[in-house]
Each structure stands twice: as C-alpha cells, then as structure tokens.
Amino acid sequence: MKRNAMAVSMLLLAAMLFNAACSAGSGAGTTAAKNESGSQSAAENSGMDSAHPIKVAVAAPMTGDNSEYGIGFANAAKLMAKKWNENGGCLGREVQIVEYDDKNSSEEATTIAQKIVSEKDEIAGVIGHFSSGVCMTAAPIYEENHVIEISPSASHPDYSSIGDYIFRNNTVISKEGGASVDIAVNDLGKKKIGIISIMTDWGTNTSGIIKGILEGMKDKGVELVAHEEVMEGSDDYSAAIAKLNDAGAEAVICCGMYNLVAPVAKQYKRVNPDIAIIAFSNAYSTQLLELGGDAVNGVCFPVIFFADSEEQSIKDYVDAYTKAYGAAPSALSSQAYDSVGMLLTAIQNVGDTDSEKVKDELYKLDYHGVTGDTRFDKTGDVDKAFVKVTIKDGKFVKMD
C-alpha cells in the first residue's frame, strides 16, 4: 500500500546516519520498566483477565534531555489504560503499559524495536517514538515484523510512508508551519519575519518549510529578514537575537521546544519588548510557563489540543491527569493518550489483537478524543483543526 523494500531500506539508512549526529545521547543499555495501569485487586474486582493482559508498549525518552516528553507519553498512556480497566478492560482483558527508554537515541531505539518485535505475540502495538529521526530508524523494523507503531509526535513528511503499520497522531510539520506563519502574518499583522531554529533534524526541516512558505508570500509584502541557527539547550542566545533585531524582525518564529522559546523570550524582550514570538505545539507545556515567567506572555502557538477547552471530556481528562501527575498535560502527551485510545478501540472493534486486522481497522476508525476528531488517511496521517493559543497573565488562552 505505502512502501517498497528499497524505499524502506534507504529511509532506515538515512535516519540512522542523521541521528548519529543529532540524537540526544545514546546511553549504555536498554531500559524496559513494566508498569501495570490498574492494580491486581482492581482487575480481580472487575472480572478482567489479568493473566492474559493486552500490553501496549510506550517507547520514548524516559531519561535524558527530552525525558519530560517520554514521561508525558507514559503518564498519558497509563491514564488511558486505567480508563479502560475501570470499564472492564479491552476484550475483557486487563490493559498494561510497558515502558521502554530509548533516550531519544537511534541506537537505543533500534535495540528496543528489535526487542519488541521479538515479543510481538505479547505486545499489541507501540506508542512512540518521540523525535522524527528516531521514529524513522525504528519504523522499518516494526513494519517488517507487522507491529503497529503510532507516534504522537513525529512530524517529518516521510515518516508515515515507511509502511502500512506506521501511523502518526500528529500533524505533518508543513501544516503546523503554515499555521504558525498564518498567526504571524494574518493574526498579528507582521510582515518582517525572523526565524530562530535549533540545529537538529527537526529544527532544520521546520525552518526550511517556514522559509518556503514565506517565499511564497513575497507578493503580499511578507519577507524573511533573517534566520539564525542555535545550539539546543544553550543559555545565551543574545548574538542570534541581536542579528534578528538588527535585521528589523517584527515577529520571530521559534523552531524549537520550550527550552528554546523561554530563554529567547526573556532575552529578546530585554532588547525589544514589542517583538512577537510564535512557537509550535511542542513548546506548549506548563514547563514553558515555569521557565519563561512574564517574558512568555504574548507567545502564540497553533495546537490541536487546548487544555482549557470547555468540552467536558477534555475537562475530565485534564482534571484526571493533573490529579495523577501534578501538572496539566501537554499537547504531545494528549496525542499519546488518544493514540492508546485508538489502538484499544481498534482491537475492541475487531475482537482480536491480530496486528493485520487491527491495522486495517485503524484506517477505518473515526475517533473522537481529547485532541479532536481523528481519522487516518491512506498513508497513516491525520488532518486536524488547529486552535490558536497565546499566553496571557501566565495562562494559556485562545487568541481573540
């Protein structure tokens, strides 16, 4: 349907080479920690079969620089499993979440993927991995062995085309990039746009997409005035900010996560308090508010999950997540939550954990979750409506 052997092999090679340079560190071994989402007594009291559970793997960085994303995936997955277990499980069987720490490393992800496929009779599917490059390293292994992978965060356009068993519950970066530019130009009325991006696969790809979009808007008087690439995790972006400011940027699109957006906002507003800053959904988190303080007021994002929605199901989810883990869920964690829900719903619908049947059902599924209405297209991608969000008085609110 979506692949040929040569294409898969080339993508695997490219991803492994690229991630050797840009991954966040590989670590010495593979960590797999099992976490049962419901207690034994809960399983017994509900009449669920806990001796033959349905296991869902969550493979993501549980340690290292990006651990908050992997931990968020796992927390959300356990919350969804708990919801199913409180209602009798899936096919009458207890749902269990099994965590694998890939450290956002291609090498670790390869080892983990090989371990998971060796146990595929016990694993119903994989939620993960986090970064696009790591996902694209592991995906051919899952595809070849007919193991379903749903990434809540991969945004590289080529990821889902690796195979029929490969899905993403995240928008392709070209669509989110277009939404970010739309905020800068049409909502905020800015014409002179700057870009600051992290020197990673995602940062390079995203900034390139933004450049292409801006190039196509020249006839509307929109121009890219400067683009600065920076190291992820740096404490000092003053040199890049000075160049963007000297170039006359009215708005800056930050191609990075909260640990880029927060310090850029702090340092830029010392130079130019009126600068407009636009970020992406991977920066939409409580960590941004904590790290950025007053400086992130006015930062804008396009997101497909808004924690302060008036929809009751979202309120219930946010309350349950906050009660369990002490903070509101991020957009990406919420996409992991829905990813588990879609996988379990497909299993329930076909009455079996056979991966071919479940895969076919996922392509047919219409799922209403906390991140909106989801339906996979023929390549395993989703198309969702964005909510435009900004920060006001230290809180996320919908843009006027």
Predicted region positions:
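Positively charged n-region of N-terminal signal peptides that target proteins for export
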Residues: 1-7, 11-12
